[in-house]
Structure formats: structure tokens, C-alpha cells
Amino acid sequence: MVKTERMQVEEADQTPGNAWLVGLAAWFIPGMGHLMQKKWVRAALMGGAVWACFFIGLAMGGHMYDLSNGNSTSSTLLQVPPMIANLGTGALFIISWLLGVGFAEDVVQAARVTYEYGNTFLLIAGLMNYLVMLDAFDIAAGRKS
């Protein structure tokens, strides 16, 4: 009897394979994980919030972080946490990096009044998308409705 209970617990802990695909899609394109599950309102609200934060951050002149602009090891290490936060936006980060949008080391851009607000919006967009991704993953895994 104990053996069957243990097997049931192990089976309950198994994550369906499509949950990983949904999670990856949700990270890569904000809101896509919920769209794949036909959760239209969640996709519009959660994905839309990430997209809006990202583009508002860019419009305010925010700076996206990567590892290439540090001169010393200590300054490079300090850029890792914000880079991980920015990387949370998935394809938005990758496309911005490829186009060079938001990565400029410009003194004029840094002097803008809205520069720090833009940085904050960009960081929040990435962190929020991590939460949206986990929500889509949990729904696909059956842990949440």
C-alpha cells in the first residue's frame, strides 16, 4: 500500500512536456504562453503590461544592460543582476540588442530627466515577464486554473 502511494506522489510531481514548451514560449514572447492555452484575457493583461513597460522604458530613454560595457571585473559583475532582469523580456531584449536600441552608452541619454525611470521600467518589464512565464507554466502543468 505504501508503494502505491509513493508511486502516485511521484506521478503527481511529473510535469507535462508541453508545460516546458509553454514556459519557453511565454519567456520568448511575453503573453504567448497564455495565448497558447487560450487564456485571452490573461494574455492581453499580463503580456500587454510587459510590452507596455518595455516600450515606455525605451521611450523614457532607459538603458538595457549587457556584459560588454564593463571595463573592470567588478563593474562587469555589477551588471549581471540587471542584465538578467532585462533578459527576462525574451525576444524584446534580443531584438533590441541586435538593433542596438537601448544599449547606447550616451552621456546625453543619461542626462535625461526620465533616464532612471526608463531603466526601472525596463527592469520591471523583464522581472514581470518571469512571473508571467511562471504563471503560464503553472497553468500548463495543472497546478493552477
Residue ranges and their predicted role:
Residues 2-23, 46-145:
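Transmembrane helix recognition focused on a "late"/terminal membrane span
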